[in-house]
UniProtKB/Swiss-Prot annotation:
Subcellular location as annotated: Cytoplasm
EC number(s) given by UniProt: 6.1.1.9
Full protein name: Valine--tRNA ligase
Species of origin: Protochlamydia amoebophila (strain UWE25)
Alphabetized PROSITE patterns for the sequence: AA_TRNA_LIGASE_I (PS00178)
Motif ('KMSKS' region): 561-565
Domain notes: ValRS has two distinct active sites: one for aminoacylation and one for editing. The misactivated threonine is translocated from the active site to the editing site. The C-terminal coiled-coil domain is crucial for aminoacylation activity.
Length: 949
């Protein structure tokens, strides 16, 4: 048998087993299989860089589901792939070329630049794939996809043409969200909003004859250069006499009308607003209804154009200052008020978004909104957690046409050709070559230079990756997919649009369930500077604080979204190097609550590294003790002996208990995974292996295994049961921690090589032997409940646990060293069932606590000083030597003195009115928390002293 090293070497084991799985093609799906199917398409990571912790979480959760279903007997397909990420990738490559070659994108032809992007894509994609493999992801790598590969490109062109032919795609002049930095339009969902402190400027606009002025309020002085009207409410009596008259627009000397419109809020500003149809969404609608001129004053790169008069060439920000300054010089600036303004920001470049009149391609959404609502309302698509439904419906209620064209070079070129002489003559073509008309007269036609929104191709991902528009065997077998797992931040960007496209193309939503994970937050630490600023701590300090080093009083902390500037990013690959893949996966699984925010504590990785060590050591103990011990090798369990099965007549309380708890845990973990409660599944598996199996059952079994008590038959029965529980436990944990469990599975399989179940063997032995006949843990059957949960046995064992807990608690309170053995008295009534159980199971209790002897009595013993604990009607006493009592009193008195000094200092500080007035609120709050904590600790010390004689 392979000798288990004392230490668990994660890196060595990780590399070994991933290569094994890959070589055996365990991840490759068979579309001709008769098994039930389970399919997931990966949310394709962008080919812009490396994976972050959000990717690690989403992909770990998907891999857990795939591995679980594979072990349950499903034909599983997990489709991997990457996304071309139009804007993001183009920006990254542009920056790279400026840095490495000193050239801008416009210094290249389109074809030259795209060659550089494809080179970047290949390198980045290879790096991402290797990182996904390091996470242990069991994707079907034979079906690796890219959103711009040949089949996906065909799918995109086919979908565009289908929508175009059905009249659902149109091109028109429309006010779009314009990013001046990337010089492209953005969809509404790609704009983030921030509240920024700004101003409300009050200007005087003169009437045509300058007989009087009308006062208007605006947050965008620079756009007045494009004003084509001013508007008032038709119900506002103050201005009814002005409706129909004309204003002479200051600075531009242009006559514009005063109009009445119900959209005007009489309570805002002066009740009169400027109308700039080409640069404001609300004004755009007013401009359409009143047939106003649309004057664009901005160039694509965010500067004032020729329509802005002498302000031409200024940026929008510069123009704002210049307009305000000139209005002030002319005596037309009345006043300026502070105003909180909601500003749109590009989700990619972080540039301020400008409303911009532009010719773009759109998908009509009116016809889709009803269906999008219905599929969620009628349960065809479940959003999990369900609280996301209200957010989803709110988005549908405010749905506007989807702008799908982008002014970029990298992406799916819009499959439209225009006739050079007549732009209204156009061809929509889905083929991979050129339309016949273009082939025959190439000089007469030109293709649209824009590309499609990245999310257009991503919306086809669940079926384009399966071969659509071709009717492939994969599409027939695996569509619709089984579930989509992704972050809630792309519910509208991606999830809703996949539902839309899947239902439109295939008359069926692409998945019945969507599990939306929360966003990962990290702990930020900072110091308050004297000028009121914030200085984040360095990386070493952050790591120390994350791992539990006490935080100084001057350092503050809170959970925030991970960002480089805050220094709270946790790199998943660094965590893998430090703690091992299985530890990282289990930490992520245990953190994957159904909350909107997931606070990721770095100590969780250390916690689960300790757990993987516990799995290793627990399994090592079991396997070593199958060969007996150094004194007696005849205790060895043979394959033939194991085949005989368990002898239920020899079962002790702990045997029945561990099987009951095993059945309960197996059933519970399956239920949790079925309901996407990954944190609960991880905690159940963790508690079972560490607490129930190792801390209790293995410890209780040791005296029998070591030959100190029991018969040879009882010892053999214990060995068999240890194997059975270990075999189920490592398979139970495998989807969460696949590497260590695969290693242990093969060692156990080798140890019991040739084992065959006899027909009369018990179901536990048969199930174990069947599992060990599998070629890998990856494809072994996942545990399901095969026995009963024995509540009576669990109740009796719970009593033993409470007695053990009470004894350990007393020892801990009295600071008894682990090597100090004491007597234990358990006192109660002879007719009390709990007293009787305690007397019956003295041997079990002795195996779990360090004692000289355990005495179960009906009368209190006559002893000197003893510490006492109570559980129900039982009294548990530990006699203690007088010397130990003196030491404990001295220690507690010193601790009390120390706490009283700290308490006095805190009280003096908080009673100092000058300190309270000057200190920031978060500092006084922290001091108050310390005060409460110190008072609580002092109370506990005094209570302990009162119990001592």
């Amino acid at each position: 048998m392979t000798e288990l090293p004392k230490a668990y070497e994660a890196k060595k084991i990780d590399e070994k087993w991933y290569q094994f799985w890959d070589a055996k093609r365990y991840f490759t799906a068979n579309p001709l299989s008769n098994k039930p199917t389970y399919c997931i398409v990966i949310p394709p990571p962008n080919v812009t860089g490396v994976l972050h912790m959000g990717h690690a979480l989403v992909n770990t959760v998907q891999d857990i589901l795939i591995r679980w279903k594979r072990m349950l007997g499903f034909e599983t397909l997990w489709v991997p792939g990457t996304d071309h990420a139009g804007i993001a990738t183009q920006m990254v490559v542009e920056r790279h070329l400026i840095k490495t070659e000193g050239k801008k994108r416009t210094d290249y032809t389109r074809e030259e630049f795209l060659k550089h992007v494809w080179t970047w894509k290949e390198k980045s994609e290879n790096r991402i794939i290797e990182q996904l493999k390091r996470l242990g992801n069991s994707c079907d790598w034979t079906r690796l996809r890219f959103t711009m590969d040949e089949n996906n490109s065909l799918a995109v062109r086919t979908m565009f043409k289908k929508l175009f032919d059905d009249g659902l795609i149109y091109r028109g002049d429309y006010l779009v969200n314009w990013d001046p930095h990337t010089q492209t339009a953005l969809a509404d969902d790609e704009v983030e909003y921030e509240d920024k402190q700004s101003f409300l400027w009050y200007f005087k606009y003169p009437l045509r004859d300058e007989s009087e002025f009308i006062s208007i309020a605006t947050t965008r002085p620079e756009t007045m250069l494009g004003d084509t009207a001013v508007a008032v409410s038709p119900n506002d009596e103050r201005f009814k006499h002005l409706i129909g008259k004309e204003i002479r627009l200051p600075l531009m000397n242009r006559l514009i009308p005063i109009i009445a419109d119900h959209h005007v809020d009489p309570s805002f500003g002066t009740g009169v607003v400027k109308i700039t149809p080409a640069h404001d969404p609300n004004d755009y609608q007013i401009g359409l209804s009143h047939r106003l001129p649309f004057i664009n004053i901005m160039t694509p790169d965010g500067k004032i154009n020729e329509n802005g008069g002498h302000f031409q060439g200024l940026s929008m920000t510069e123009a704002r200052h210049a307009v305000v300054s000139e209005m002030k010089e002319k005596g037309l600036l009345e006043k300026v008020e502070p105003h909180l303004n909601r500003v749109g920001i590009s989700y990619r470049s972080k540039a301020i978004i400008e409303p911009y009149l532009s010719k773009q391609w759109f998908v009509k959404m009116d016809g889709f909104s009803k269906k999008l609502r219905e599929v969620v309302q009628n349960g065809q698509v479940k959003l999990i957690p369900s609280h996301w439904e209200s957010t989803y419906f709110h988005w549908i209620d405010n749905l506007r046409d989807w702008c799908i064209s982008r002014q970029l070079w990298w992406g799916h070129r819009i499959p439209i050709w225009y006739h050079k002489e007549d732009s209204n003559r156009l061809i929509c073509y889905a083929g991979s070559d050129l339309p016949d008309e273009v082939k025959n007269a190439p000089e007469e036609w030109i293709q649209d230079s824009d590309v499609l929104d990245t999310w257009f191709s991503s919306a086809l991902w669940p079926f384009s990756t399966l071969g659509w528009p071709e009717q492939t065997s994969e599409l027939a077998k695996f569509y619709p997919t089984s579930v989509l797992v992704t972050g809630h931040d792309i519910l509208f960007f991606w999830v809703a649009r996949m539902i839309l496209m899947g239902d439109y193309a295939l008359d069926q939503p692409p998945f019945p369930e969507t599990y939306l994970l929360g966003l990962i937050y990290g702990k930020s630490y900072w110091r308050q500077e004297s000028n009121g600023g914030i200085l984040y701590v360095n990386e070493q300090e952050r790591s120390d604080f994350d791992m539990g080093k006490p935080i100084p009083k001057e350092v503050f902390s809170k959970w925030e979204k991970m960002s480089k500037s805050k220094g709270n990013i946790i790199d998943p690959l660094e965590m893998i190097d430090q703690f091992g893949t299985d530890a990282v996966r289990m930490a992520l699984c245990a953190s994957a609550t159904q909350a909107r925010q997931i606070d990721l504590d770095r100590r969780r990785f250390e916690e689960f590294k300790n757990f993987t060590n516990k799995i290793w050591n627990g399994a090592r103990f079991v396997l070593m003790n199958l060969d007996g011990n150094e004194q007696n090798r005849t205790m060895s369990l043979t394959s033939q002996g194991f085949s005989q099965g368990l002898d239920e007549a020899l079962f002790t309380l702990e045997d029945r208990w561990i099987l009951s708890v095993l059945n309960r845990t197996v059933e519970s973990v399956n239920v949790h995974l079925n309901h996407y409660q990954f944190d609960q599944a991880a905690i159940e598996a963790y508690d079972f292996f560490w607490k129930e199996f190792c801390a209790y059952y293995v410890e209780i079994a040791k005296p029998i295994l070591f030959g100190k008590i029991g018969t040879a038959q009882e010892r053999t029965n214990k060995q068999k049961l240890l194997v059975i529980v270990l075999c189920q436990a490592i398979r139970l944990i495998h989807p969460m921690a696949p590497f260590i469990t695969e290693e242990l599975f093969h060692i156990l399989k080798e140890r019991l090589e040739g084992v065959e179940a006899l027909t009369n063997a018990d179901p536990y032995t048969k199930e174990c032997i069947q599992a060990l006949q599998s070629s890998a843990c990856l494809v072994a059957p996942y545990p399901v409940r095969i026995g009963e949960k024995n509540q009576k046995v669990e109740a009796v064992f719970a009593l033993m646990e409470q007695i053990v807990y009470t004894i350990r608690n007393i020892r801990g309170e009295m600071k008894l060293s682990p090597g100090t053995a004491t007597d234990v008295y358990i006192i109660g009534q002879a007719d009390d069932p709990e007293w009787q159980s305690a007397r019956e199971h003295i041997t079990m209790i002795s195996a779990l606590v360090k004692t000289r002897r355990i005495l179960v009595e009906t009368e209190e013993p006559k002893i000197g000083f003893a510490c006492t604990g109570v559980y129900h009607a039982l009294k548990i006493q530990l006699p203690l030597p007088e010397e130990l009592l003196k030491q404990e009193k001295t220690r507690l008195n010193k601790e009390q003195e120390k706490l009283e000094i700290s308490l006095e200092k805190l009280k003096n500080q908080l009673s100092n009115t000058d300190f309270v007035r000057r200190a920031p609120a978060h500092l006084t709050e922290k001091q108050n928390q310390q005060l409460s904590q110190t008072e609580q600790e002092l109370r506990e010390i005094k209570e302990k002293l009162m119990t001592l004689p």
